[in-house]
Amino acid sequence: LYKADPFAFSAEYRPGTASVTADISGFSWNDSDWISKRSQADMTKQPISIYEVHLGSWKKKDREEKDGYYTYVEAAHELAAYVKEMGYTHVELMGIAEHPYDGSWGYQVTGYFAPTSRYGSPKDFMYFVNYLHKNGIGVILDWVPAHFPKDAHGLADFDGHPLFEYEDPRKGEHPDWGTKVFDYGKNEVKDFLISNALYWVEEYHVDGLRVDAVASMLYLDYGREPGQWVPNKNGGNQNLEAIEFFKHLNTVVQGRNHGVAMIAEESTAWPKVTDHPENDGLGFTFKWNMGWMHDFLEYMKLDPYFRKYNHNRMTFSLTYFTSENYILVLSHDEVVHLKCSMINKMPGLGEDKFSNLKAGYTFMLGHPGKKLLFMGQDFGQWHEWDEKVSLDWYLAEEESHKKLQEYVRDLLHIYKKYPCLYQLDNDWNGFQWINANDGDRSIFSFIRKDETGKKNLLFVVNFTPVDRPDYRVGVPKRCKLSLLLDNVHGAYKPSQCPTYTSVKSECDGQPYSISYPLGGYGTAIFRF
């Protein structure tokens, strides 16, 4: 039996399984300005809009060809141009560490230190990161310390016995996924994983790691029936060793690399995920807001008539948004396994679907928290994501899809331009409801504020097809409001923004108000 080198820098192109000797020294990096700026910034107060990408299916040289992959070098140029035009600040890459099975999407890793050879060499991947940095785009990697596959050449039973994994199968095997679980109580295993995290950050200059399946690491009974798991020394279901691992991991990575984001995909209500370890937190920079995602999608899928009975699905997340540093995510997991693409989740036919999605994305942009959108969902990909084929890029040339794409682009550029949309994401001072209770008409209005409290944006979003030609919305002071964007025109040119002046007329508990013609599925963002 031949095993791959756990520390190999490169691997054979699948289905080959051998490790490949690779020299990763000597690459000519020229992203020092980017790294310096990153190290001085507080990421929680920066605009972060993430484009989640699976390189193997983002674009292909032949859409239907099994491989037909762009190389890291080719993808760097294509992807940077697209991301820059759209206004995303970061890309998050799935499946970069070497993995044998395409259908795992890169979440069953056999080569933790090897960029997958599907797209080129280690230095090709360095080129990718360097090129994106030169274009002002950050790079985040999916990282999988939760489990590893049982492939014979991988880490499982590495010396003929459990070595990297827990020996007791009640802790060392994940029944749902058929994979092995790392033994977080072994110093050697913890060092292996932490050195791997540092390797990607320090050797490849990546700007963050999105840690996959955190909940499966935190709970000993995750995915297990009674009798299939072992309680901790206190009789509880918390994996105390994994908790200490996270605290140590985040302290080391962020202590050595200020400005690098550690992001938790944590699907439960585990407390203090993004708090400091000295406060008994796990020490992550951000946490995916899975609760918001679930409530948002359940609401958006409803026929507009029934939305008034589910109004709280859109307001509930605004009761806890300060509890963590959140990222609002519409990820790959939501557009696979018969869940439908984002556009096909929307009710109605034809243009109604596009109008619904524009309204949903506008609400998402205004909601506190950083943003993540999976590839294809910004232009309305009809099909669910399939890792075997390219996105349907021809759709972006069709009018409805192109208008949706341009609308998302306008939203993202507004997001980067106005600090009120990102400076106070987990601070009550950064958000103010104007009307959270207009459930009968399914209209939401709220204000986002910057640190000065003087440069604000007012959002109004209508989630029904009913026109409101004289919709009155409260405003806290006498002022002029400039309409930056609506669902009909997209973003207005600065010199062409329609203006409205608030009048002394109480509305929504505010002393002033404006009247605005709010169309069906209408959206409006005002600056004041």
Residue ranges with predicted function:
Residues Y131-N135, F158, P162-E167, E173, ...:
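Active-site-proximal helices and loops of the catalytic beta/alpha 8
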Residues S341-Y361:
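Aromatic-anchored helix/helix-loop segment that forms the rim or "lid"
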